[in-house]
UniProtKB/Swiss-Prot annotation:
Binding-site positions, a divalent metal cation: 8, 10, 42
Textual note on the cofactor: Binds 1 divalent metal cation per subunit.
InterPro entries per the UniProt record, alphabetical: MECDP_synthase, MECDP_synthase_CS, MECDP_synthase_sf
EC number: 4.6.1.12
Reaction(s) catalysed (UniProt annotation): 4-CDP-2-C-methyl-D-erythritol 2-phosphate = 2-C-methyl-D-erythritol 2,4-cyclic diphosphate + CMP
Pfam families cross-referenced by the UniProt entry: YgbB
Broad enzyme group: lyase
Cofactor dependence: a divalent metal cation
Gene name as annotated: ispF
One Gene Ontology molecular-function label: 2-C-methyl-D-erythritol 2,4-cyclodiphosphate synthase activity
PANTHER family, alphabetized: 2-C-METHYL-D-ERYTHRITOL 2,4-CYCLODIPHOSPHATE SYNTHASE, CHLOROPLASTIC
Protein name stated in the entry: 2-C-methyl-D-erythritol 2,4-cyclodiphosphate synthase
Organism, as annotated: Trichlorobacter lovleyi (strain ATCC BAA-1151 / DSM 17278 / SZ)
Amino acid sequence: MRIGHGYDVHRLVEDRKLIMGGVDIPWEKGLLGHSDADVLLHAIADALLGALAMGDIGKHFPDTDPAFKGADSMKLLEHVVGLIRTQGYAVGNLDATIIAQRPKMAPHIQAMRENVARACGVEVDRINVKATTEEGLGFTGTGEGISAHAVVLLIPQ
């Protein structure tokens, strides 16, 4: 068994879509990034890579590479899952937390879980996604950005 942790953060800006866990969330702002800036999927990909000491998404998908400009983070996650499978591992379970003051994530959590489960090739009962606020504190609390953490347990295939 291997355990990995991932973290990501992006700034909220106008004139961008807000995509979280592969779900397009209606909101007045979106996350700024080289790709679609899906912080949840980025944290999950980092957790998967970290569990096998394979670096992070910046190593595999550098923001200096035009090929990843506007990239769909679901495709990036699917690629990372392929990498862990070539190393003989699969997702045992995954627990992730989105930290955002607004918008409310609860209406979208189940769709996020289903998207992540599909990308990881596992049943949805192995994937947990939850959201919290920081009670108005810090950059997420003031609405400047959104962050996410993920912890994953990989098991031999």
